[in-house]
Amino acid sequence: TIRSIDFAMGNDNLAYAVFKPSTIITDELLAKVSEKREELTIEEVKAYREFKERFMAFCQRAYDNDVRLIVDAEDYCFQDAIDTLTDEAMRRYNKKRAIVFATLQMYRHDRMPYLRRILDDAKEKGYIAGVKFVRGAYMEAERARAAALGYPDPICKNKQATDENFDEAVRFTMDHLDRFEMFMGTHNEESNYKLAKLIDEKGLKRDDSRIFFAQLLGMSDNISFNLAHEGYNVTKYVPYAKVRDVLPYLIRRAEENTSVAGQTSRELRMLKSELDRRKRGVSN
């Protein structure tokens, strides 16, 4: 993470660095801190303190390098602890601009209340909140865990409710851009169209540095290229790791939005059409 933050410093082609907190702490300890079901042992208190120090060290490095840092989302059972640390980091490092960004998975029905709390806190403490919106990636696991442990399902009842929650979060943030910077990560064509239209309706510059669209590298390039061509800020999200580690991540991204299936078919048709066009060009 430190290397990626340093690499991004001064590089106009890298809009953000990203890190996933669960890679530097055990799942068991992160869940225990988040769920507050049991007291931590002395060893666990020490381990969590070291985790927090590393978390804040990443944020400090991003601040020192003037690099925006996205804190990736986690499972529901981990997220409370991550939210607490991210909120603290935003208060500390986002005084003049958004350096630290929280990730909100909008398939969770509690994320709009959390977003409103972030705004209230930003106004009270005097900072700029960084928010990244995605629909979400752990639906089946979330519901299974809720059923197993007997707590309410944290997920919106259906895709329509998730879409409405996502759209509401984007509109809310756009209505309070004096206290927010936003990164919208989605392959959903309608969501991208709505934000582009909203930027224009509000009379904002299309390349307003507070607003970025994002898609995964290799996915929905038709959306990315068209947005960029029209002058909007677009970044490609690039997960990198050993294949066995990164493949499950990519599969979750494809599964998280049921509309992706239709869009993937559309992308394949476009690719086939382009290949056919090139073949005709060669033969001519």
Predicted features by range, described:
Residues 1-284:
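Positively charged, amphipathic and often flexible ligand-engagement surfaces
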